[in-house]
Amino acid sequence: MFQNNPLLAQLKQQIEANKEYVEGTVKASDKAFGFLECDKKSYFIPPMEMKKVMHGDKVKAVVKREDDKEQVEIDSLLEPMLDRFIAQVRFNKDNKLQLIVDHPSIKNIIPANTHKKVTETLESGDWVVAQLKTHPLRDDRFLFAQVTQFICKADDNFAPWWVTLARHEQPREPVANEKSYELHDELDREDLTSLYFTTIDSPSTQDMDDALYIEPIKQGEVQTGWRLVVAIADPTAYIPENSNLEKAARQRCFTNYLPGFNIPMLPRELSDDLCSLVPNEKRPALVGYIETDLAGNITGDTRFVSAWVESKAKLAYDNVSDYLEQVENAWQPESAETKQQIDWLHQFTLARIEWRRNNALLFKESGDYSFELNEDGSVRDIHVEYRRIANQMIEESMIIANICCAKFLADNAKTGVFNTHAGFDPKNLELAQKFLLDTLANDENRDALTALYAPEKLATLEGYCEMRRSIDEFPEKFLELRLRRYLTFAEFKSEVAPHLGLGISHYATWTSPIRKYGDMVNHRLIKQVLLGKQAKTVEEGILVRLQEARRQNRLVERDIADWLYARYLFPMVEQAVEFDCEIADVSRGGVRAKVIANGAQIFVPFSTLHDKKEEMEFRPEEIALYIKGEKAYQIGQAVKVKLTEVRLETRSIVGNII
């Protein structure tokens, strides 16, 4: 009787038209209920509705109102949180396989089966990769997954490495060695083995891709400048352009430097032996001749040649720094030639540092944290290492070499893998100006600073450098840290463009071809120019892959570090250890503080900072928390934090500000 009833159809249409739909992302809570986070509002999801979804699902829902209360009823799935995911194995009381998702906010236990290609016998706690197969909203079935890859056993101490690499789909093994390697030289190689090249690296470094020789330029008896000869390892001489090795390097893009070990971009036989500029061994190299005046200005064009070189000494950063800083009982150069090279390179470096201070931008000094591991992968200690003078000597030599490479490629090849940075994101230029003026301007200097920080000026290389130099002496860290949030990302481009972060008009790296694929590409382009060939424009796909691989490697390094920090600090909870920290972030949930001594990040919930929520105000534009209208905590602020909890399963570290 109701079939094909036009009145009923009309009624259904009216009911549907009166429904209020919203779209958003599911946010789980510690309880059975959750919230739907929409653009401008958050809606309550009751427990029964939460059974249809999981944290992170993007869904469409209907708003339901009763009295003054609002909640949503889930309508449909827009995008599931999970597709491919990492999990730990467990078995229920009936010995059925289940998966615990490795995500701090996902509490769902997912039934699963195993793909036939997984041959390992799974045990409780094992780490696996899985694929979500069914979802209640999409398939009218409960959540169900399939294990597609075994990662490691539950008790594997190296789980942080293997799990993280699997999460980001990164290889854990080096590229396999070839049976043999042949040189494929099109250019004649000059014999430069008589030049006294040296390398400066960490003692443990095997993949040495740069060696330096320096001498003064003289007119008669008067020194007028410096001639720096930069020899760079030449892996492209062993790797044909469309070979499997080239394709593997293009996919990896970078050597992955992880706590405890690295995963090289090239086979170790190449990276650590045939191409590495080891002492007292003849090696093929691409060599650049760079000349400067005594003030560090580049004079004339850089000359590139294909050559044979032989490093005469492998020097260590700390030894060279101790010698130059005249540390008591310091290491001394083992020959007069080595001493001369160190002293000349030191003088050249001081000139280049001063040149960059006046004409570009210098890096703000901040320590690098390194994990010292036991053989079983446990953390013995964490060290903070600062750049000393020997590090700066290599750094300045590589920077000038990369500036010269960029100019050579721009002038001759008209293409390359150029490192670029546009400075502030265009949409943030006015915000950056406002922040600078709010922080620095007073009645006397407001007009001058308004002109200095004009958005159109901040968008230029010259204007950006002027701004950076003007804030160099500002005593508080929050200014520098806040400005970073307005910056855009560095990019690889095939056409020359400024790198505002360095304060340089053109920059292209070629000094690390053993560990960076973009440098290999630039080597090939330099060789094409030297051969008189038409250089091929760098493919967009290469630039995209470089960008993605750089992002992935940073995430891998961060995730492993988070895990190791949690392991390292876990035994200290009982001792209620206190740390000197610096606030690294302020968000709606709390404060994140970085431990100065070891780099760990400790989360401090807002609830521990003040007992009256209504008296607290988070101001995102300042990255600050106000209490009772007064600024209480801000990014860059020094605080003391007591460690209160470490959750190993989520790698979260919690503390209280004291």
From Swiss-Prot:
S1 motif domain ranges (all copies): 576-658
GO biological process, one term: mRNA catabolic process
Its EC number(s): 3.1.13.1
Catalyzed reactions per annotation: Exonucleolytic cleavage in the 3'- to 5'-direction to yield nucleoside 5'-phosphates
Record GO cellular component, one term: cytosol
Record-linked InterPro entries: CSD (IPR011129), NA-bd_OB-fold (IPR012340), RNase_B_OB_dom (IPR013223), RNase_II (IPR011804), RNase_II/R (IPR001900), RNase_II/RNase_R (IPR004476), RNR_Ribonuclease (IPR050180), S1_domain (IPR003029)
MF annotations from Gene Ontology: exoribonuclease II activity; RNA binding
Entry keyword Plastid: no
General function of this protein: Involved in mRNA degradation. Hydrolyzes single-stranded polyribonucleotides processively in the 3' to 5' direction.
Homology family: Belongs to the RNR ribonuclease family. RNase II subfamily.
Protein name: Exoribonuclease 2
Lineage of producing organism: Bacteria, Pseudomonadati, Pseudomonadota, Gammaproteobacteria, Pasteurellales
